[in-house]
């Protein structure tokens, strides 16, 4: 089927270039463009696109406000474009919490160069985002248990954007691509009907991709500060984003959250974010677990890679690891979970109904590796009941 895309961006160059690239994809139809958030909301109502690409810093109405309004009046999967800066990361997490599905780095250099690589990336991402379960505004924000807040980190204030003249441009109609035949849905093998018994795990590993920032925030903000095991979080994310993500989770939760550093010993009550652009391994030092950070292997698609982290931990602590796979596209984590199971450890995965993208957890479940399949809201209580 042809996917209808609405492009919202105040940069005339970026808007035109993005439209050119998207229009060259046979099963994508750019149905309109907008130069600010207010126009984006109006055109979303009028055109009812399948996917909206959204900048965050725009005149009249910024991207985050536009996402909230779109989720209220015309819920539609939104793909954010964000700068690779601390401020870009901060507002991207706000946009994801408001209801956006995923994000891509906004690179004028990449957009002005060879389009073949960015074309493949955009095509894959837009197809995945179009399948996402969007969330209504208000219901999208993770509901956390009321807890004493940590001191808030100072929030950078950005300069007001320069005004830009509104420009909208409906795309010229093109021939529709022939409808694709529906693919058979993989069968999810039933997980064990009983709950896995409470165990004294040495480490809890959580792997996720698309939809993960909101899912992780929802889980971590419901865990007590005295959680009895360390958590290692592997989220597919650029290197410039993981420090800001760790700071956000640390500010919002009672756990201590930080980006993992090479050589540090994992401690209960702490959550460690695998740094972007590198691989995070867990090694054993006596009875303790220690972090080992390596430069990302160029042969691996994901940096950080869930399979790498899970696999490194499997033989170090046989039968003493809990692996959790949350929402995300692709199958990263399946082989790592297989290694955990082969060494006697336990695996939980997220269910289809509450996954933004049911890719990674489906890969684990269909391979028969999940001991429990849980809804997103069930993970925090199960972690509290099952770990310790």
UniProtKB/Swiss-Prot annotation:
Active site: 209, 236, 332
One MF term in the entry's GO annotations: protein-glutamate methylesterase activity
Alphabetical list of SUPFAM superfamilies matching this protein: CheY-like, Methylesterase CheB, C-terminal domain
Cited InterPro entries: CheB-like (IPR008248), CheB_C (IPR035909), CheY-like_superfamily (IPR011006), Sig_transdc_resp-reg_Me-estase (IPR000673), Sig_transdc_resp-reg_receiver (IPR001789)
Main location, first listed in the record: cytoplasm
Any one of the GO BP annotations: chemotaxis
Highest taxon in the source lineage: Bacteria
Keywords, sorted A to Z: Chemotaxis, Cytoplasm, Hydrolase, Phosphoprotein
Record-linked CDD domains: CheB_Rec, REC_CheB-like
Pro residues biased stretches: 148-164
Places the protein is found: Cytoplasm
4-aspartylphosphate: modified positions: 55
Record remark: domains: Contains a C-terminal catalytic domain, and an N-terminal region which modulates catalytic activity.
Protein name (record): Protein-glutamate methylesterase/protein-glutamine glutaminase 4
